[in-house]
């Protein structure tokens, strides 16, 4: 039941974040300010912290987003959304080892998670680990043979490696 609520919150957060792309940066900052004010009264609200982190990402405030995901993961170390997005934030900050750890922890919780496997493969390519990247992307293609994104990612890695 808790996991369903978490997934619903994740979907709602993503929908909110996707809808926010049409907003101006000023509107995003206003939403973020409102979230900060509400957080002052409900500092333990993980859902609100996840939303705040999503707005931080939209505004490219990587450090603030990371702090929110750190808080969520201290309270719920198996929060799938927080692990995934913190990995993304760490990657954007150039903290590849931390991003790799988050993707690997996520894959321990949800083996075969498509986005985490893809993120890890692309991270390894970016971090000059070509053998690991290619092995991981091939595993991804083998596990998801009907997924065009997996093939496109493998094609991108092959082009970068001049294969």
Residue ranges and their predicted role:
Residues 46-47, 80-81, 114-115, 148-149:
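Helix-start (N-cap) detector for alpha-helical repeat units in TPR-like alpha-solenoids
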Residues 58, 92-93, 126-127, 159-161:
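Register position in tetratricopeptide repeats
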């Amino acid at each position: 039941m808790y996991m369903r609520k978490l997934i619903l919150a994740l979907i709602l957060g993503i929908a909110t974040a996707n809808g926010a792309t049409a907003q101006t940066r000023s509107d995003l900052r206003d939403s973020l300010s409102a979230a900060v004010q509400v957080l002052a009264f409900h500092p333990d609200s993980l859902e609100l912290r996840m939303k705040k982190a999503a707005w931080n990402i939209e505004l490219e405030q990587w450090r603030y987003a990371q702090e929110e995901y750190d808080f969520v993961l201290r309270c719920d170390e198996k929060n799938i959304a927080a692990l995934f997005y913190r990995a993304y934030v760490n990657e954007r900050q150039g903290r590849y080892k931390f991003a790799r750890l988050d993707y690997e922890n996520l894959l321990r919780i949800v083996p075969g998670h498509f986005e985490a496997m893809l993120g890890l493969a692309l991270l390894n390519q970016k971090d000059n680990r070509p053998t690991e990247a290619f092995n991981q992307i091939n595993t991804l293609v083998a596990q998801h043979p009907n997924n065009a994104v997996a093939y496109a990612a493998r094609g991108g890695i092959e082009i970068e490696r001049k294969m």
